[in-house]
Amino acid sequence: MSPQTETKTGVGFKAGVKEYKLNYYTPEYETKDTDILAAFRVTPQPGVPPEEAGAAVAAESSTGTWTTVWTDGLTSLDRYKGRCYDIEPVAGEENQFIAYVAYPLDLFEEGSVTNMFTSIVGNVFGFKALRALRLEDLRIPPAYTKTFQGPPHGIQVERDKLNKYGRPLLGCTIKPKLGLSAKNYGRAVYECLRGGLDFTKDDENVNSQPFMRWRDRFLFCAEALYKAQTETGEIKGHYLNATAGTCEEMMKRAIFARELGVPIVMHDYLTGGFTANTSLAHYCRDNGLLLHIHRAMHAVIDRQKNHGIHFRVLAKALRMSGGDHIHSGTVVGKLEGERDITLGFVDLLRDDFVEKDRSRGIYFTQDWVSLPGVLPVASGGIHVWHMPALTEIFGDDSVLQFGGGTLGHPWGNAPGAVANRVALEACVQARNEGRDLAREGNEIIREASKWSPELAAACEVWKEIKFEFEAMDTL
């Protein structure tokens, strides 16, 4: 043993296992403006005190490990360690609490959502002392936010590119999602766009399969949208899914989309990964492409109330990584989403400054310091009867996406698109005239259907369709 090692172990180091709370539970700590703050819903194993469980989360997601190590003496743990600074019981739950943890900014690489998540949630969720753990919210400080480009363009730039103002944008996912040839797929795109939609969309699992290779799909969809633009005089788009098995292949597809002159591409950001997503977002800004984001796989991560990561955290991460649209649930359709909670993370996507509001699940005040906003996309089981509620809930800065609610029209795709466009224009006009969409919505749709046979047919088909299940995502 060298003299230096002997001195270190003899004077300052004592091997063994210490309780986490001795170093990582610090209720006296005053958080700094530069700290990343996290709110964890913790369910400890029986016999584990809240202070020890909260401290364990702070330790295992920052500088700690299960035993004392002599290299602790070679750095300043007080500077780098995470701290559990507050513990709050969860109302109505016997053995569950919210642990608030502060992380020094120096723990994280600038501009890397990948590194942020690897640190905060990468290892601690498998910790045996915890029965379950859920990351409910993060406060991203301005000092860290400023290291990210964020969305390639943002809401205002997108509206300027499309020359469309004063209403939600309308979209449609092409169905069946798998099995169509590229030419038939392009035909479906054309019919929807000429009928009045702003966008059509590849579904999340449309990549480059044997029945429809990506290059063929891109070419036929570009032909369809240019033809629809010529006929309607409106700028049209189709979300060309660039998601691929490698980043290099993804970028090749995005480059080809740019060469075709189309306005927008798409990425599955969770299955594709944050590193790939951020790379694509940077390319899109540099080359004038809008970026639509699908959240495929999100429910695997966020659906369980006691374990995983809440979608509001994934939404914040997407705004940092980069995307101009992201699917956000509908409140009224077939997919998960309770109204107040959904609107909470919708505000976190769109607004520049969002106050703490626990009634909407927002644990921290969030200042985005002018990072561009993201348009929420309402999609999944919606149809013309939902239009008043969707317009009232999401407002103008949103994309309302009707897949089956367009393609399921008894007269075909173009009449289905007409029905949705007429319903939307009627709702926007009624709202601008001061009418109450929540109370008068059905009447507004019925009035409009008198002047639109396409809307009348859609109203008849979907008059009995409801998705009345209790939301899992509650406070």
Swiss-Prot record:
Residue numbers carrying N-acetylproline: P3
UniProt PTM: The disulfide bond which can form in the large chain dimeric partners within the hexadecamer appears to be associated with oxidative stress and protein turnover.
Active-site residue numbers: K175, H294
Presence of keyword Plastid: yes
EC code: 4.1.1.39
Binding site for Mg(2+): K201, D203, E204
Entry GO terms, CC: chloroplast
Pfam families the record matches: RuBisCO_large, RuBisCO_large_N
Cofactor(s) this protein requires: Mg(2+)
Cross-referenced InterPro entries: RuBisCO, RuBisCo_large_chain_AS, RuBisCO_lsu_C, RuBisCO_lsu_C_sf, RuBisCO_lsu_fd_N, RuBisCO_lsu_N_sf, RuBisCO_lsuI
Entry's Gene Ontology molecular function annotations: magnesium ion binding; monooxygenase activity; ribulose-bisphosphate carboxylase activity
Cofactor remark from the record: Binds 1 Mg(2+) ion per subunit.
GO biological process, one term: photorespiration
Binding site for substrate: N123, T173, K177, R295, H327, S379
Keywords: Acetylation, Calvin cycle, Carbon dioxide fixation, Chloroplast, Disulfide bond, Lyase, Magnesium, Metal-binding, Methylation, Monooxygenase, Oxidoreductase, Photorespiration, Photosynthesis, Plastid
Presence of the UniProt keyword Acetylation in the record: yes
PROSITE patterns: RUBISCO_LARGE
Oligomeric form and interacting partners: Heterohexadecamer of 8 large chains and 8 small chains; disulfide-linked. The disulfide link is formed within the large subunit homodimers.
Function in brief: RuBisCO catalyzes two reactions: the carboxylation of D-ribulose 1,5-bisphosphate, the primary event in carbon dioxide fixation, as well as the oxidative fragmentation of the pentose substrate in the photorespiration process. Both reactions occur simultaneously and in competition at the same active site.
NCBIfam families listed in its UniProt record: PRK04208.1
Protein name: Ribulose bisphosphate carboxylase large chain
Organism ancestry: Eukaryota, Viridiplantae, Streptophyta, Embryophyta, Tracheophyta
